[in-house]
């Protein structure tokens, strides 16, 4: 079978490497790809956000399956475009990809369906956000740009001055572009951060092994957050007890909540 991978980063490199090991696959394309991916796939000079061109390419080259690696095209509706053309594609539709594309949506969903999450407030007015920080916030506190920001749109602020500066950076200076039109102000939580990726078919969820991500730019857990400086798997902190709690209160309830909202999720959910 022929496979097309959409993206140009380390994630897509890992997907290409894995797909190349399948005896069922005889041809791999990647758009746009990169020099490392070229070891496993034929790189195609079509941008990840050029949905019509990508779908045309898949049709013309009789691609059997397209795998979307990047968040931006998923949130933009690439799966909808491919499905409308009768093409097989792996990833959530636009109305489900909002789970990753909008932190405010995700927080509201969890609140509505009683899925455990940190206390929060959403703001689309910087003055109201500043007023909240000055009157109700407890520090340290977390500021999150609502939209996609390559994993960098989260600021942990230790005092009011840092938080005020953060609001202005995100909402007024548009440090993260339109991702900062809305902002989530969230309770700061202590503890170990563990990530779990999961396969979802709209109803059933199958989790992968856990992973522990290191987001800070500098050694010693210092500096700003990034999309990830490194990771290891499995995490020793993801115990059987933690897994049982998450399976019961987080994973399946999230899938069920999305279905109840008419946003059936098919693809990979990142917890």
Give residue ranges: language-model regions.
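Short acidic-hydrophobic, aromatic-tinged amphipathic segments that line or gate anion-handling sites
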Residues: 43-49, 121-125, 157
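Internal nucleotide-binding/catalytic subdomain
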Residues: 153-271
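ATP-binding N-terminal substructure of ATP-dependent carboxylate-amine bond-forming enzymes
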Residues: 1-94
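A conserved helix-loop-beta module that forms one wall/lid of the active-site cleft
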Residues: 90-153
């Amino acid at each position: 079978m022929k496979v097309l991978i959409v993206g140009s980063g380390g994630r897509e490199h890992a997907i290409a490497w894995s797909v190349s090991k399948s005896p069922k696959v005889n041809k791999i394309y990647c758009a746009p790809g990169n020099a490392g991916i070229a070891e496993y796939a034929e790189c195609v000079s079509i941008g990840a956000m050029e949905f019509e061109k990508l779908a045309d390419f898949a049709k013309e080259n009789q691609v059997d399956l397209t795998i979307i690696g990047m968040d931006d095209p998923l949130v933009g509706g690439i799966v909808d475009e491919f499905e409308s053309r009768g093409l097989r594609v792996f990833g959530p539709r636009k109305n489900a990809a909002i789970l990753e594309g909008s932190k405010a949506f995700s927080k509201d969903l969890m609140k509505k369906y009683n899925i455990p999450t940190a206390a929060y407030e959403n703001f689309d007015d910087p003055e109201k956000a500043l007023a909240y920080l000055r009157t109700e916030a407890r520090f340290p506190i977390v500021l999150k740009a609502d939209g996609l920001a390559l994993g960098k749109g989260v600021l942990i602020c230790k005092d009011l001055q840092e938080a005020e500066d953060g609001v202005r950076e995100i909402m007024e200076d548009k440090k993260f572009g339109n991702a900062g039109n809305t902002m989530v102000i969230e309770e700061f939580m202590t503890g170990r951060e563990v990530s779990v990726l999961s396969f979802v078919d709209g109803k059933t969820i199958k989790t992968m092994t856990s992973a522990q991500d290191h987001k800070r730019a500098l050694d010693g857990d210092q500096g700003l957050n990034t999309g990830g400086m490194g990771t290891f798997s499995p995490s020793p902190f993801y115990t059987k007890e933690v897994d049982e709690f998450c399976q019961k209160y987080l994973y399946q309830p999230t899938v069920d909540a999305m279905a109840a909202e008419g946003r059936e999720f098919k693809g990979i959910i990142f917890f």
